[in-house]
Amino acid sequence: MSAFTRRTILSAIAASGAGIAPSVSRAQQSAPAESPGARFSYDDLIKKAADIAAAPFDGNVPPLPEALAKLDFDAWREIRFRPDKGVIGKQGSPFTLQTFHLGHLFKRAVKINILRDGLSTPYLYSPALFDYGKAKFDKPLPPDLGFAGFRVHYPLNHPKNTDELVSFLGSSYFRVLGRGQQYGLSARALSVNTGLLDNNEEFPFYREFWIDAGDANSDHVTILALLDSASLTGAYRFDVFPREESVVEVTATVFTRSPQQGIGMAPLTSMFFMGENDRHYNDRNHYDDFRPEMHDSDGLLIQSGKGDWSWRPLKNPFIQKVSYFDASDIRGYGLAQRDRAFDHYQDIELAYEARPTYWIEPRGKWGEGRLELIELATKDETADNVVLAWRPKEPVAPGKPFSFGYRLTALLEDARLSPAGRVVNTFSAPVGALGSGEQGGPGSRRFMMDFAGGDVGFHLVDAGAVEVVASVSNGKIVRSFITPNAKVNGLRATIDVSIAARTSTDMRVFLRAAGQPLTETWVYTWNDE
């Protein structure tokens, strides 16, 4: 993966004031003077993307003024948008726009246009929009400089103050927040060739945006985006609805310049360094940190085309690992942060317990395809090391539009998504308690998972009526059993697994009662390393 990751973007946004700056009073914001513009719609954007795809790719990035290009991170983060300059849609619209300045790692300018009543007006760069802090320039910056990206603010957590709702900065990344949430993982418009061992991933990027903030009665903001890369172009529409669980309705039409086998739809990017299920980096490297866990997401949640639910805890592998999941006509998937207990993280500033889950629901049937989960080894929590995307089975052919849509929901609790019991903890340990007669031996390991929610708690007083249904792709299950766990109002399932040295096995476990599934299926891979 590129060194220019979402984690870099996250750090940059935080340093520029997003997520840590005080909320802005709506009374402080002003609207620019109306000016005439050309009519523009999503259909016009589709035509524009098609025309660009038919022409040779232009990857040229005009150089920044020397003084701006030389800014280090500390100097660049001194440049902050002036909140009182926030652009409002029509008079009284609850949505306001703030832009990010070019410089440091952000060298490719994007164009921004404001849509009002279907008319497009360019939103032009001006030094008056920014407070430059300690950053000084010998010469005035050019008036056609452009922007690195933008964010939209809305009274999300308080009726009189605005908070950041959604941001677009770097490549094709975007992020959205619901009420009481703090930025963690990111979404992308599209991925290309992610996970290739030759590190030949392509990063599509936004060239231009059109933003419609509506009027005083608007319940959403619409963002049109033109995507481009060496292999393809894309016309994207993001309808962003601020809520307790904010929603982004994504509509996309992609045009490829050549047949593309490696397109990833609705990709997500996150970080998992250490959790209760995977502490090997700490254990083997004597990692010295007060925080017990560090992750933006702790698992992959899937609802299959048949309606079955499964949960795959994330890991920080020793080497890059790619996992595939059959996902034909998939109903939903996402990277989730299930662990909401502060004392599991102990990080007052970063608040991992408030990081959102992003849940993806396709609009219509996507057909045959698979989910691709990529987990990269990381030595700390600053690197994004988890990528997830849905890949169609058939290559995307040039010469015709490839269209799809989906809903992205930013939520804190995923229990409402499924009535089944959920996995709330995953642990592993040597087989047999200290001093017991149980024998493990080489190539054996014990795995424990706590199930709670749904009807699981009903069986606390009669755990014997519940069956552990377990299978492995390699090796054998030596034993399995259930223990009531009142601490989670649920049941702990335990399996002891044995495999040959230096091999791996895929494990699946769910609970069954009266012949019916009681829980989602726990899915996990164990490598005997």
Identify the residue ranges that each predicted region occupies:
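Solvent-exposed N-terminal domain segments of exported/luminal and surface proteins
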Residues: 56-196
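N-terminal secretory signal peptides and thylakoid transit peptides that target proteins
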Residues: 1-16
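Extended, loop-rich substrate-binding clefts of extracytoplasmic carbohydrate-active enzymes
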Residues: 186-243, 363, 367-375, 379, ...
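A contiguous, surface-exposed recognition patch within enzymatic or periplasmic domains that forms
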Residues: 74, 167-169, 181, 261-403, ...
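Acidic, contiguous internal or C-terminal segments within carbohydrate-active enzymes
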Residues: 225-274
